[in-house]
Each structure stands twice: as C-alpha cells, then as structure tokens.
Amino acid sequence: MKSVLLVLSCAAILFQPAGAKPQSAEPVKHGGKIETKYDGFNYETVMRLRKMKVNCDGFKDKFKDACVSIEVALHCPGTQVNYVKHVSVQVVFENKDWVRLHSPDQRDFSIVTDTETLRLGRMSPVAKNQPGTWDTKVEVLEANIPYATFKKIAASQSVELQVGRDAVELREKNIAALKDLNSRVIVPTATSSN
C-alpha cells in the first residue's frame, strides 16, 4: 500500500498540469513595429522602433490638425545586442497644410519624466531622402542621447517630450513600445564564483 501511494505521489509531482508551471510573458500589444538589422556600412546592429504616432490633436493649446510621431533607434556596435553605444530619437511634426518649422533657437530638446526634467541638448533637422524637394508639411528633428537616459525614459510611468515651446505627452502604448524596445537589449547575468 505504501509503495503504491509513493508511486502515485511521485507520478502526480512529475506530471503536474501546465497551469501549475510558470507561463512565459505574452508580448505587449502596443501597436509599434520594432525591427533589428545589421548595418554593414557603420558596423553596428540597430534596433529600431519604427515611426509611431504620439498625438494627432495638435500641441498643447496650439495648432490643431498637427500630428507628432517618434522614431527611436538603439545603436549597438558590431553584431551584438548587449551593449548600446547611443540612442537616436527622431520627433516628426506633420500637418495637413503646412508645418511651422522650428528655428534653430527653438530646437532645445528636453524630456519630462515622473521625477525629473532631462535636458538633452539641441535637435538637428534630418535630411530628406529626395534631393531637390522641400516638403512644407513634414519636419523631422533628431537628437542622440545616452543609453542610460533612454533607460530612465523607458522605466517612467509618464513622459512628455518638449521641443522648444512645443510639448506633447506620450501615450501608454508609446511608453509600452519604448519598454519593449529596451527589453530587447540582452543584459548579461551576474555570475557568482564559488
């Protein structure tokens, strides 16, 4: 009787239902597209959150029908994805009719997170792919920031982007996309030597 009970208890432990085992986390549904590509010309691996809309309601108390989007890229030297050299952030301003371009003195970039304001310097305009064209409906500004600063932004509950006098707050799905992008960096585990 004892041996039957012992065999049954061992079998119960070995064949536990799948519900008792820890489940892997489901991917976050934020609507953003994240891609990883190796750039052979610059000898780096780029993990990029493709252009993602933040707001199409205009800026705070200004310019209705204006859309703001972001694109973020993590630049990792070589073919590895466990060290990020720097992060490039692009802020895209679009309008149906025209965009009031930011003059050089109105390109100061700062990000307000839960607890602090991060002043990240001056943004620069991104060159268009088509030479000889001038699109008055789109303005793309870019800034390079340290990875440590990006980690602070991705870990925040609320994030507001400020370019000059214009400010826009990221939505929950935008913050979730930044967290997802940051989670793709492989963090080396600490090994203990005995």
Spans of features found by a protein language model:
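C-terminal segment of classical bacterial N-terminal signal peptides
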Residues: 13-19
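Extended Gly/Ser/Thr-rich low-complexity repeat segments
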Residues: 67, 102-111, 155-163
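Mid-length scaffold segments of soluble, non-membrane domains
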Residues: 89-130
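Internal interaction segment
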Residues: 122-194
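Short, surface-exposed loop motifs enriched in S/T, G, D/E and P with embedded aromatic residues
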Residues: 22-38, 49, 113-132, 170-172
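Bacterial N-terminal signal peptides
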Residues: 7-13
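An ectodomain-focused feature that recognizes extracytoplasmic/extracellular
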Residues: 21-102
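Positively charged n-region of N-terminal signal peptides that target proteins for export
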Residues: 1-4
